Amino acid sequence: MEKTMSNSTPTPAAHRLGLVGRKVGMTRIFTEDGESIPVTVLDVSNNRVTQVKSLESDGYAAIQVTYGTRRATRVVKPQAGHYAKAGAEAGSILKEFRLDPARAAEFAAGAVIAVESVFEAGQQVDVTGTSIGKGFAGTIKRHNFGSQRASHGNSRSHRVPGSIGQAQDPGRIFPGKRMSGHMGDVTRTVQNLDVVRVDAERGLLMVKGAVPGHAGGDVIVRPAVKAPAKKGA
């Protein structure tokens, strides 16, 4: 946890270095006391710096990183030139992290960021991914509505939402009304997940709980924005 003096300015949440990777799946870890902790395994190995941006050339300081691999036939020429200029292998995902100018200057294009240099056990992180798509779903599944009566005069309206508005006045359905529709397949962030273990050798990050998306889906891991301060910090 970062400690700051009363007369100093804490690092903005948008200026913290993260990593990109993929969701491997879920398992459990047993502590020395025999406690079973459900964890999600995230592969954040081989994060490569593809570009370093500075105030002088770009107007802000940031680094761009890539993860994974992509076949040469799937890389368009502008991207191929971008990767070649950085001296980095083409990846499946690109992500930019804004940093303080001094922090961004520590990196060079083509460098590999090790997971242990960014995260440590006991830290809290925010994980962003694409949720699992459920297709077209009704209000009971999509919005946790209650169902109508199973009998006693109800024959065809067991799972309908009921009234969705008023009469001729206002004569419309208000925006934001919860109704049936496409469910899932949206970007979601789970906040304040505890880092249970960091496997530096294999580049794995194990966080407590679940993260959005299928196994094999792309994820972005950042230091937690709303991490509670430790007592005495």
UniProtKB/Swiss-Prot annotation:
It comes from the Bacteria. GO terms for cellular component: cytosolic large ribosomal subunit. Disulfide bonds: none annotated. The modification N5-methylglutamine is found at Q168. Keywords: Methylation, Ribonucleoprotein, Ribosomal protein, RNA-binding, rRNA-binding. It holds the Pfam family Ribosomal_L3. GO terms for molecular function: rRNA binding; structural constituent of ribosome. Residues 146-171 are annotated as: Disordered. Transmembrane segments: none annotated. One of its GO terms (biological process) is translation. Gene3D superfamilies: 3.30.160.810, Translation factors (2.40.30.10). Methylated by PrmB. InterPro entries: Ribosomal_uL3, Ribosomal_uL3_bac/org-type, Ribosomal_uL3_CS, Transl_B-barrel_sf. PANTHER family: 50S RIBOSOMAL PROTEIN L3 (PTHR11229), LARGE RIBOSOMAL SUBUNIT PROTEIN UL3C (PTHR11229:SF16). Part of the 50S ribosomal subunit. Forms a cluster with proteins L14 and L19. One of the primary rRNA binding proteins, it binds directly near the 3'-end of the 23S rRNA, where it nucleates assembly of the 50S subunit. Belongs to the universal ribosomal protein uL3 family. This is Large ribosomal subunit protein uL3. The gene is rplC.
